[in-house]
Amino acid sequence: MSSSRYILIPPEDLHPLTSNTGNEQNIYPDFDPWAHTEIEDKILLSFVAKGHYTSAKVNFESISARSSLQESLPKVAGMLAEQFSKVVHLREQTINKVSGESEESIRGKAKFTDLAGPGFSLPNRVTLTDQRRTQWLQELSSPNVSLSKLAKSIPHGFKRKQILEQCYMRQLPLQRAIWLIKSSYSIEWKSLTSKLKPGQTNEGVVSQLYNLWTNSMVSIMERLLFEMPKYYNDTAQAKIWKPRVSYYINLLGNCYNMGLMDRGVFNHWLVEFVEKVENFEFLPLSLHLLNIFWSGICPPTHGIEAPDNSFLISKITVVLLHKHHMILQNKSMINDENYIINDLQRNARLKESLLLRLKAFILDIFHHQSLEAFIMPNQNWDLYKNCLYEIVTMDKTSNEQAMVIKRKLELITYRNDSLQFNLLKQYKMKSSSLYESDGVEIDNLCDMQSILNVPFLDPEMTKILDNATPGYDWTLFVQQRFTCIEKVAQMIMWATNPSRKARYDGAHLVAKLLLLKTTSQENLPDYNMEDMIWKLVFHFSKLSERELSNIVELPSLYELLNIFIGYGIIKVPTYIRKLISSGIMYISDSKDKFFHCELLINLKISPLMKNQYNMMLKNIMEYDATYYVRYNYEQLQIQLNTAKEQMLQEQFEHISCLPISVKIWVSEWYLSYVCSPVDNVLKPVDKGTVIKNFTIFGLYLKEIFHFYKWVEFIVYHQLLADINALSALIDVLLYYENLFPLLINDQILFMKTLIHIYSKGLKNKDNLSYNITEFNPFWKFFMKHFPYLVEIDSDLQLQLGEVYESEKIRIEKLTKSSVDVITLYCNINQVNEESFKFGTHNFPGIFQQNLKILLKTESADACERARKGLSLLMLANLGDYTKFMSIFLKRKDYTIEQLVKLISVKLLTLDQIQKIIGDDILREILSRNNYGEGLWYELHKRNFIKKNFKIVLSMYRNSTSLDDRKLFLDLLVFYGPNSRLQEQVTTIICNCLRESNEDYSLILSLLRYGTKNIDQGTQETINIAKLYENLNFTNLWIFQAFTNYYTEALFNGATSDGQTITNFVFELIDLTRYNVLCSHLFDRVANFDVLEKLLEVFEADFFKKCLSEDPDDVHFLAVMIETIMNLSRKMNQSSAVISMNNESFRLLQATMLKFTSMNKTALCNSEMKLSIYLKIFIVHQKFIFQKVCDSLRQDRYDAEADLVKSLRLLFENTGFKLKLRLLLYDILSSLKSFVIYECTKKSESKRETRKLQISEALQNLPPFHISSFLDDMSISAHGDFDFLGLTEQPTPAEPEEGSQFFLYNKRTREYECGLNIEPFQLLPNHQSREPGSSCHFFNDTALSLSLFDARFDKKNPT
């Protein structure tokens, strides 16, 4: 082809000298005409006429110019210094100042001020009447009226919101609406600029106008959106509303694109609006808005640079993931009265549509935005991780992109995990092999600790179970914690442990969790769960009697298994088949068969299994015939019939001795009996019946499940006779508060029915008791623990509010109105109001009279009237009531039983007893149990102990009574695992150990609580370290308290056993067999110096292990790093910077040098050590960063300065493990930010300090992209692009028919010739070689074309 290199292109803004005639070529001058001024003419004439001469600096040109230069250089330097000073001042005052507005908004804010050319004038503001203004708007909305006629004036007082409202209400044509907005903008701007005050600028006025207009546009848009529910059932109004919204969105889009609003403010509003929308009815329109303005919020980056609004992108990412998660979890999208909730097809379509739109947004961010958008806090990542994986993996992509997507997901996951910095993943313990094999085939006896060391042990799960509250979200717990089948064993052993036997809700809670797991989407197979339960039972049978009693409370195990049977989780036939196939029942020297026989006797057996049950008992008759003789199926039926007859005769004492299977049959029969009508009429239930049935079901039979079934029956059938019966029932519900959500199937329906009974039925039936009885604690209990249920049902919320407020007003009225009090008192005692006077002067007489009747009279009616009278006195005048009750208590004319009775009927509190009488009486009262008046006494006692836990325990701590000592242990064991009281428990245990002079019998008593072998041991027989062999997840809180005491004693040298902290901590790790719980032993250590010493011991040992050549012990290292992490979290609560001593810092530097000297193979083998090292580095990173900065500031090239280079070198050499590389990237990026901050920070010292130099290794840190975390050496060595998701393209051969590209001549508008180029556009750029050359040449076709204003065009040349 002919070269066009020297062809000149005609200039654009210059006219030719000759006109273009025919085919002649235009001729252009090579200079522009001179446009000069009068002054320039004078200067030119004077220089031309007189000439110009510049005299020499020296007299003779031959003389050296050195003197002249020496003179001028200092002047030049001074001038240069002045200029540099001005530059620095300008930089600090102008350039480096952070503007309050975004650059985008500043760039686009002056468009409307460019009005027009000469002769243009803005419309005038004219005052019009309402009628004329309406007429003007009608003409403006009509396209038949010329705009030039209307453009001369605009109505006065017609601004912003009014203009926008009229635009969408009258549906102005968009061009005219934009003209009106622009004109109003300009008029306001012109008015404001004419009134500028000193110091104000035009930019400030423009910014103010943009904010005002944007806020107006946003508020109207928000108002229109929230008006939507008003028109659901009004078709006529909905037809008006829809066009208005559509028009206004269109108008907003035009204003957005034309720069008539602050885009930054609008984008932030839109993201926040989508975030705060919770009702699904607003979501479709919100997502539609987001779709319209999506390019402004998330502009495409093409992977080059992150946009300026990265914060907004991160925020909208979290919002979209949250919406996606909420829609997936929600069952119904429809909230419309015209549709039923069970409209499954319509609901599924809505759900699918919303999810598709959300997925599209999230995928767009994932593919086209920076990965930083998916870096989020711990709680968000845990919640949305599965959503992100589901969205991305369901996206249909080509094979080439699949690996890139996988790499991105790994990068996001590891980055979040490294920032989250959780503990290491839990690993299987050495004893987990017991759970991996079939339990029924194990011939050896399992040891106790092997069973307790369950695989995948989760201490956090035990903590949550111990702190269970009524309203806890157990569905979320199952999703996040119940992740593998091995967790079943941990939950069962938690519920059946002797230390948890006082937990009334343990068995029912575990059963509910297993049910939730079986019904969840990611459920465990039923047979796997049942097999795991029976395996654990067979493991229990292998234990000796002593070991079994240490870890299992057998009645609790029987109760739990029967609940499982009731819910269908396990089946007795399966258990019997396993017993038969195992052959255990036929082995003569096996003691397992007796355990299984006792278990079978206590399991509920159906009549169909009668023969198999009897057969199993017959098989051991030669070893022990009593099992079959006493407990065969027929004998159990006889015990059932006997129990029925005794219960009908009100004889309940012998029921407690029955096997649990018989108790279940008796409970089912009694439930049917009390729910059956008499003469076709259901008998009303009074207070006595409630207490009696609770005593039978809850105390004698231990079947609280059937009691709750009876409670549901009497509530739904509205059988409560009076307020007293309701009060007794509510006391039971409050005492067993954790069972409320577990055993009440429909809490909303139950509460609605209960409120209806209270406010409609009993209010009229028992109005007297209604006015003096408070139920607000129960209403508050429900609203506090079940807010989600209250939000779901607006009717329930309204009813709860009504009863709560009405009761509150009623009680306040009694305190202010003596007339109402007199009326109520007269009605209680059935006396005439005229003959009775109630006042301050006769309050003592009334109080003493009623109190005497209550305590001394045997008549139930008289006691009830006295109780109501005292309750009325307490409500009417609490101050006087408390005063006279104090006088009564000080006289000490009462018995303990009488005080307990006063507490049981809610007329006395334990706080009053503690304050007035003292601890002696209080201690005796707390040791009593009383159920005669219901459960209020037990409920009040429990609440008092929780509130005054430390005081109560101190009363029993030093008591010599065996009963007091037992109660002290009971309280410690029951409340010890509770996180809210654990600090107080730890303090009490430590004080007891200090006072006992190294007598550790208290620890042994706590460890052996509930067992039969209470061998306390002596001082000489107790080995401190060997105590930790008993460590398991159920008694961790005991060892935490003991570790707190003992480590502090070792630190202070207060022990006499010759131990040191170093020996102690490593000995207990060995003795616990690297138990994962060992890392939590120091969670209760409060002394900061002790924590610092412990951290120093662990880190020094780890560094020495890294420097040695010993093989790695994976289990030991796992326990060590978890311990270090826990200690660092504890220290971070007290100090922001965790320092290191000189020896530890020296070891850290030496370990870094060893890692940097390793090759990649050695580093790969030391991966776990390097990971732990980096986490220790992060623990001390503030301290280390300060050391590095001090070294860089002083220009010392010592170990601290080399640390930066070593980190960067490790970053380059750890391509084999992405997580390690991300940890190093976190450290390097944090160090870079820290150094930059130190550079800009002003020195506190006035003297000049050396400027901090940023290391080149930090300056060249790559951005957070995929390419920054790929192993370049492996790429260049292997040439393999598969891991990027890219396939190598073969170089296409040159087409035979001609070239694929042609040169196009702009002048002649013809294709001149073909152009042969190399396929540089392919990703694997295979360069061709020059003829006779063995090296590659650079394909610069695109660069060459650009030099001639040429480009590639995708148009078809034909």
Swiss-Prot record:
User: Which family does the record claim for this protein?
Assistant: Belongs to the Mediator complex subunit 12 family.
Protein species of origin? Eremothecium gossypii (strain ATCC 10895 / CBS 109.51 / FGSC 9923 / NRRL Y-1056)
Specify the superkingdom: Eukaryota
Q: What is this protein called?
A: Mediator of RNA polymerase II transcription subunit 12
Coiled-coil ranges (or none): 629-654
Q: How does it assemble?
A: Component of the SRB8-11 complex, which itself associates with the Mediator complex.
Offer one example of a GO biological process linked to this entry.
positive regulation of transcription by galactose
- Functional summary from the UniProt entry: Component of the SRB8-11 complex. The SRB8-11 complex is a regulatory module of the Mediator complex which is itself involved in regulation of basal and activated RNA polymerase II-dependent transcription. The SRB8-11 complex may be involved in the transcriptional repression of a subset of genes regulated by Mediator. It may inhibit the association of the Mediator complex with RNA polymerase II to form the holoenzyme complex.
